[in-house]
Amino acid sequence: MFSGGGGPLSPGGKSAARAASGFFAPAGPRGAGRGPPPCLRQNFYNPYLAPVGTQQKPTGPTQRHTYYSECDEFRFIAPRVLDEDAPPEKRAGVHDGHLKRAPKVYCGGDERDVLRVGSGGFWPRRSRLWGGVDHAPAGFNPTVTVFHVYDILENVEHAYGMRAAQFHARFMDAITPTGTVITLLGLTPEGHRVAVHVYGTRQYFYMNKEEVDRHLQCRAPRDLCERMAAALRESPGASFRGISADHFEAEVVERTDVYYYETRPALFYRVYVRSGRVLSYLCDNFCPAIKKYEGGVDATTRFILDNPGFVTFGWYRLKPGRNNTLAQPRAPMAFGTSSDVEFNCTADNLAIEGGMSDLPAYKLMCFDIECKAGGEDELAFPVAGHPEDLVIQISCLLYDLSTTALEHVLLFSLGSCDLPESHLNELAARGLPTPVVLEFDSEFEMLLAFMTLVKQYGPEFVTGYNIINFDWPFLLAKLTDIYKVPLDGYGRMNGRGVFRVWDIGQSHFQKRSKIKVNGMVSIDMYGIITDKIKLSSYKLNAVAEAVLKDKKKDLSYRDIPAYYAAGPAQRGVIGEYCIQDSLLVGQLFFKFLPHLELSAVARLAGINITRTIYDGQQIRVFTCLLRLADQKGFILPDTQGRFRGAGGEAPKRPAAAREDEERPEEEGEDEDEREEGGGEREPDGARETAGRHVGYQGARVLDPTSGFHVNPVVVFDFASLYPSIIQAHNLCFSTLSLRADAVAHLEAGKDYLEIEVGGRRLFFVKAHVRESLLSILLRDWLAMRKQIRSRIPQSSPEEAVLLDKQQAAIKVVCNSVYGFTGVQHGLLPCLHVAATVTTIGREMLLATREYVHARWAAFEQLLADFPEAADMRAPGPYSMRIIYGDTDSIFVLCRGLTAAGLTAMGDKMASHISRALFLPPIKLECEKTFTKLLLIAKKKYIGVIYGGKMLIKGVDLVRKNNCAFINRTSRALVDLLFYDDTVSGAAAALAERPAEEWLARPLPEGLQAFGAVLVDAHRRITDPERDIQDFVLTAELSRHPRAYTNKRLAHLTVYYKLMARRAQVPSIKDRIPYVIVAQTREVEETVARLAALRELDAAAPGDEPAPPAALPSPAKRPRETPSPADPPGGASKPRKLLVSELAEDPAYAIAHGVALNTDYYFSHLLGAACVTFKALFGNNAKITESLLKRFIPEVWHPPDDVTARLRAAGFGAVGAGATAEETRRMLHRAFDTLA
């Protein structure tokens, strides 16, 4: 440890001293534009020259914060490569010791203490208080009347812990002995940060009075309070020893359980509780036999719902409350947050300010970190738990969210760093701020400076790329595990706050994390991009090219150690790379404006933005239903064990399941796992997935009439099918009955719907008997959405964007209602409602089919309904037939009618069907008309819409797993089929005959152009000069490799090869590129070694990859006795490797000249073509492949390595002749030569 006096230094101290002396050596020319003119650093720390005494802590009142405002000793970890004067053998690894001095930062030749607050700071600061000292300018006393809220916090305060003199009596009463306080965080129109502490909010739950009185012998509400207090005092531990009946308040109210029509109103105890912990304990443990209602509702939700009009994101106004009471400003020394102004008030002091819609000047921070392994292997992927694996740079861009202006560019660098002049000039040319480079001796000082910026500047919104799964977890693990820094004071709260990242859990599909920071909303653009657009790769560079038409200067992870060790100039290259990543993410943020849509959802659902981002769809519907239920006199039961399956047995709750999770739909998952032994698909019915148990049969479809249809096909869509079914048939928990006697007094058909679902009769009363709560919600939401959309055309561009995000948010919540009822372990499940919706949907498809076939079977019948059809007659016989029905779409094949006429008449046809068959608001709409349609299978088709646009759905040629070559070739084939009339005619003739007939006869001549594309593709695949990049396939790493059931996957093979070669391994959710190579001796040896590596990694704990020194040697096998079938010499024939074992990293294949497996790629091309075009041959894939192969000449193509050996021996390639006679002469000459 470094001594505070002049004593000798320990080995750790000498290491740090060498790091410091090397770091502070005179530097070369500095980059321009980074503050004061370059100069030698003065007064730097060097333990050999000047001992440093311990800093004296300021005296004064007890500190009310837990962030670092002073520090005089810290753990010093720095890479030895910063010792630039040391010999090379001394520059490996890291210095690790303890240092007694204040943390330092250097910028442009100046030196400052990281934690010192004063004029001339190196980064912007917005906080008024720091370390208990008020730094506001003289006379600072802003008046706050109106403020915007973006986040809401809740905590419990105790009266004995507060200074009574600083609080009005009404606030002290609200927290005596304890009480929940809601804190609204926001900004005033002038840009002052404000925190409003709202006292008096109480959580509560319900219990049936009759059951409570019978079980507990209660005669009055006070008796119940005494029983609860006694139960808490007897609970294990000392948490509730001081609880008395005064902690509770109980009253008797009349409410109705929301489940089932026959449930009658009853008396309930409503129990008010002063703390969420007490509420949770009571609902889980107090009299388990008595059902609890709404015990899981948090204090923030209660605050929003119990005060009509209050929102989680919007403008508020302070006003006089009851008895003309006013909000009380807090003295700065009593602040609990890093705001400029704080108030105490009660809910009656608040009102919504409805006349304002613009956002105030919130700040957005966009950041990115660069890391480097610091152990013996610097190419290993860094692990936050390893002290030697370091964060070396952090880029930090600060934006004004309202103007989108980039205000500051900061680069935190471990070691000196000179940004390239070209980069500085580029930023200046774009009108962007000059970066401020902040340099540090050690990792702790850099991380502390970054967190100090976060605290002092306090951005309301934070973004980055994959920051939830990597950047934040890495930083927080470093700070808490390595440096033992408490983080509870680094959000908006000064202490006892939340600054935490945790895993939601590793679901079947992906590993996801979530972050919660008081007063800071983290929006990861990686998640936004993967939700919004479909790409073959979600690397930032690929996304930037696709979305921004921009690209970054990429820097390989393998190059970072060398660049970092090369000195300030090369570290500047890393800094440029780090800054440009943040710049691209900032552009993506303002391209998609995710905060607008998320805030609109949060406002509608009554939850804060963080819950909107991380807590799934369930909570959004639940809070809205909770609000409406209260207005209608209903209460919602706590659901654990509440809803029983068909067998009458309550399903057990999975340990890892969360009520608010839903299984994400991940395109490409099936294809990534179906190769070589992928898992079987479960049948329809009950299906258990991570956090989601669907206990009913899903929507069905009308089987497609596969083939190539060259007559017009009209597609009708049901508008908002499932929401409209719920509305039309009044479906709800509260309108459902499972008993016939419950509706016996009502008239069937008129007063209730009777329907059989899954072999059971269900009854739903009509709206005039009892209106469905779900229907009311949907009706109000859709009316709101319609009103918002009507305002968009008359709005300014800025307001139009906001309104569009609001209407999109409403649509998202509406579409969540059906799924909300169908999750068995959800917040409020009702599988009968979900199953009824899908049953009615299928009946609607069948009814539509029967009506169309009967009503418009003859052209005269069509004319009777639509006289204008006379002008749209086309040559040929007339018919109208439904060829496919898919959940909410119906495909109608119309022969003898023009596509133009059907397009014009489609809406009238849809309205006619809607009026004849369906209850409003269910309605059909004409979505499109195909002029040609290749209908392959369910959810798989390709068609050309009237007007020329091609639509492709569910077909392999557009899947992101295929390589570029196969995608291009498949697309060329499809374009020929649809846009070449000769090919289209031949294909239509092909599809009209049974596929077996074509095995014995030539294919139509019109397919020659089609065959020419296949011949050319075959030539390109076998061309030795081909571009390997055209043959790169990709697959998503959806979870850690050890979590895969099927290990025989190509992208997993490449993952382990990269690990063995010390290359950067992909992160979860990355797409891994690979090529399939030819089987050679070298490949076989690598596969054998890789098997050992997989076993080693499987034994590694947690998610940490095993770090072997090299590819392990294959296990020795016992010598086998040659069999009679073995070749001479006794050597056994090598086994044929699986395709997944032949996968290789494209960069490695190019660098080492590894030959591709041409047979695989042509088979893959034929496979993709067969899946697409098998509809031409009766969906018989085997016959399709056989017929497509007719176009390819039978030529033997030796492997590339064999070809090379033959050429080296003087042999040349001879192709087939143009005619059979020419080929015969060539073969004759060859045999004569060999003879």
UniProtKB/Swiss-Prot annotation:
Residues 640-691, 1098-1134 are annotated as: Disordered. Transmembrane segments: none annotated. It holds the Pfam family DNA_pol_B_exo1. Residues 662-675 have a biased composition (Acidic residues). One of its GO terms (molecular function) is DNA binding. Its EC number is 2.7.7.7, 3.1.26.4. GO terms for biological process: DNA-templated DNA replication; viral DNA genome replication. It is found in: Host nucleus. Residues 650-661, 676-691 have a biased composition (Basic and acidic residues). It comes from the Viruses. One of its GO terms (cellular component) is host cell nucleus. Gene3D superfamilies: DNA polymerase family B, C-terminal domain (1.10.132.60), DNA Polymerase, chain B, domain 1 (3.30.342.10), Helix hairpin bin (1.10.287.690), Palm domain of DNA polymerase (3.90.1600.10), Ribonuclease H-like superfamily/Ribonuclease H (3.30.420.10). Disulfide bonds: none annotated. Belongs to the DNA polymerase type-B family. Forms a complex with the ssDNA-binding protein UL29, the DNA polymerase processivity factor, and the alkaline exonuclease. Interacts with the putative helicase-primase complex subunit UL8; this interaction may coordinate leading and lagging strand DNA synthesis at the replication fork. This is DNA polymerase catalytic subunit. It comes from Human herpesvirus 1 (strain SC16) (HHV-1). The lineage of its organism: Viruses, Duplodnaviria, Heunggongvirae, Peploviricota, Herviviricetes.
